[in-house]
Amino acid sequence: MGSLSIWHWIVVIAVVLLLFGRGKISDLMGDVAQGIKSFKKGLQDDEKTAEKSEPVKSIDHTSTPGATNRTDVGSKAV
């Protein structure tokens, strides 16, 4: 009783077709396809802008005068 037979699925599909009609379902599927295409195009545009962007610059670590290293903490300066 918990599983649906083929006749249940046929009735469900018939009701959906009656409610939405053939034109609305095809319009809906067209909108979904257009959304997927625009999403893929957006992903490709992001990859192109990432390639065109400037390379990442690294910051050189230099110690400032008066700064002590962590290993020098507690030792006496000579």
Swiss-Prot record:
TM ranges: 1-21
Gene3D superfamilies membership: 1.20.5.3310
One GO MF term attached to the UniProt entry: protein transmembrane transporter activity
Keyword Transmembrane attached: yes
Compartment annotation: Cell inner membrane
Lipid bilayer topology: Single-pass membrane protein
Alphabetical keyword list: Cell inner membrane, Cell membrane, Membrane, Protein transport, Translocation, Transmembrane, Transmembrane helix, Transport
GO cellular component: TAT protein transport complex
Biased segments, Polar residues type: 61-72
BP GO annotations: protein transport by the Tat complex
Region entry Disordered, spans: 43-78
Main location group: membrane
Domain of life, source organism: Bacteria
Signal peptide limits: none
Biased composition (Basic and acidic residues): 43-60
Subunit composition and interactions: The Tat system comprises two distinct complexes: a TatABC complex, containing multiple copies of TatA, TatB and TatC subunits, and a separate TatA complex, containing only TatA subunits. Substrates initially bind to the TatABC complex, which probably triggers association of the separate TatA complex to form the active translocon.
Family per record: Belongs to the TatA/E family.
Job of this protein: Part of the twin-arginine translocation (Tat) system that transports large folded proteins containing a characteristic twin-arginine motif in their signal peptide across membranes. TatA could form the protein-conducting channel of the Tat system.
PANTHER family: SEC-INDEPENDENT PROTEIN TRANSLOCASE PROTEIN TATA (PTHR42982:SF1)
Protein name: Sec-independent protein translocase protein TatA
Species the sequence originates in: Rhodopseudomonas palustris (strain TIE-1)
GN (gene name): tatA
